[in-house]
Amino acid sequence: MSRVVVIGATGHIGTYLVPRLVDGGHEVIAVSRGTRGPYHASPQWDAVTRVTADREAEDAAGRFGDRIAALRPEAVIDLICFTPASARQLTEALRPSRPLLVHCGTIWVHGPALRVPVTEDEPRTAYGEYGTGKAEIEALLNQETRAGGVPAVVLHPGHISGPGWPVITPAGNLDAAAWTQLATGRPLTLPDHGLGVLHHVHADDVAQAFELALSRPAAIGGSFHVVAEQAMTLRGLAAGVARWFGREPVLDFVGWDEFTRRAGPGDAEVTREHTFRSITASIARAREVLGYAPRYSSLDALREALAWLVADGQADIGDQPFPGR
């Protein structure tokens, strides 16, 4: 058993991770802004110590790292660190006590793939604020570990999916109309022949990897992809979803200009951000070192997500029967 501080404890990953840690016998301190509970209630949360903190404000005031260190953690799981300055403040505060630090990165530390599957050893070619920030944090934490400071592990999830929030659809964005079109047999517009690649992962599989990292000393100083066993193309995801409803997908392949006109600039840009990378991430290292074994395929994760979205009124599948509806 260890004393584990989870930062961002009530988010997508923490909702699944905190109960896992409690079941594993850990003493858990859950840090969040306190504005809402986890996405799904479970009795394990009754055994958790809750701490309310606004990281952005406390980072700006220079207090957040010291606040976490004062909790006397043996391990810190940081699910919401997005800037090198934030990571630096935390590691400097933790350096005297040197707890294990497990950081949530992203497969977007990789830019457009040159070889597939992409391994953790590929040179970092991130672009955009989110990906480059995470790549810089990864480099900072690796250097921290090599220098004998805070021992760190970095986990890189794909597109985190599951019940409780909107997820990236087979159109590569968050527009729920894609679910309606696939369920009811209406045409779904896709760019580039639908060959853009997405690599989803169920939030509970991400939680599994974080839990495993706490007990794998060989993981220290390493980075690991945490995704479903296989990535899928947009057209493959569309076919899988349509078949839940006994259909073959009706797909309308167009160029980017026409896709942008139909989808709108905002949704088209989200699709472009995902498909221009088209990352297929290898999990061989996570399997070998962490013992990571994802339970959910990409379609499994989307199926659970869609069942929840339909039940919550956020997705319309018409009169189609759907398991879990």
Residue ranges and their predicted role:
Residues 4-24:
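N-terminal Rossmann NAD(P)H-binding glycine-rich loop of SDR-like oxidoreductase domains
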Residues 69-116, 132-142:
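NAD(P)-cofactor binding segment of oxidoreductase domains
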Residues 106-129, 145-148, 165:
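Active-site "gating" loop of Rossmann-like NAD(P)-dependent oxidoreductase/epimerase domains
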Residues 139-167:
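Conserved beta-loop-beta element that borders a ligand/cofactor-binding pocket
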Residues 162, 190-196, 224-231, 240-243, ...:
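Glycine-rich Rossmann NAD(P)(H)-binding loop
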Residues 170-178, 190-214, 221-222:
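Substrate-positioning beta->alpha
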Residues 203, 260-293, 314:
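Conserved C-terminal active-site "lid" loop/helix of NAD(P)H-dependent oxidoreductases
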Residues 212-271, 304-306, 316-324:
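Mid/C-terminal beta-alpha module of Rossmann-like enzyme folds, strongest
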